[in-house]
């Protein structure tokens, strides 16, 4: 009987030890994941704060999203209705905006963190989806082309920008809504400048794992 008790006690101790070890390993993995999330979120937050500070007193008709860092210009600033040619006013806006914007994103402080700088065109819901998809794509591309025109004033990091900038058209897939839930056609016609971090995909995966851990 005493031998059985000894065996039982040993098995119980091993089980408790293994359970404790597994718990500690899981706890360490969760802590490591949370630290990585904090680091990525911290970098993004720093960039957003720098953008807000740089443009808070700007006369440009633009908005900085405090959550994502996306910078939104009304479409009327750059383009006439149904046109993808950058207007003279739009060029003036770009000449003032781009050097400041790129000087932040591609500075020594943040350059290694940036995966993409995205110029994104959006339209209102007038007309068909495909027509507006083409129009929004053409507008985004026109903005990028304008930035690299030989007549556009030179700015710091212009050469580096070529490797990370992209132009996307979204048609009317992401409209801006009024308080009553209806579409604000004027605000929906817009151009947005966004940035994506190299660790954004990792952040999405880590946050997804966090949701699973919480279930």
Please report, for each region that a protein language model flagged, where it lies by residue.
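Short terminal targeting/anchoring segments
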Residues: 1-42
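Charged/polar helix/coil "stalk" or linker segments at domain boundaries
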Residues: 31, 42-77, 91-93
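Second-shell loop/turn segments in exported
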Residues: 33-40, 77-89, 128-134
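Periplasmic peptidoglycan-binding/anchoring modules of Gram-negative envelope and division proteins
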Residues: 51, 64, 79, 83-118, ...
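Short N-terminal helix-initiation segments at or just after the protein's N-terminus
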Residues: 58-71, 114, 135-140, 199-201
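Soluble periplasmic/extracytoplasmic beta-strand elements of cell-envelope proteins
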Residues: 61-63, 70-78, 116-120, 166-168, ...
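Surface-exposed acidic, glycine-flexible loop patches that form ligand/cofactor-binding
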Residues: 61-62, 106-111, 156-158, 182-183
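Periplasmic OmpA-like peptidoglycan-binding domain that tethers envelope proteins to the cell wall
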Residues: 88, 120-203, 209
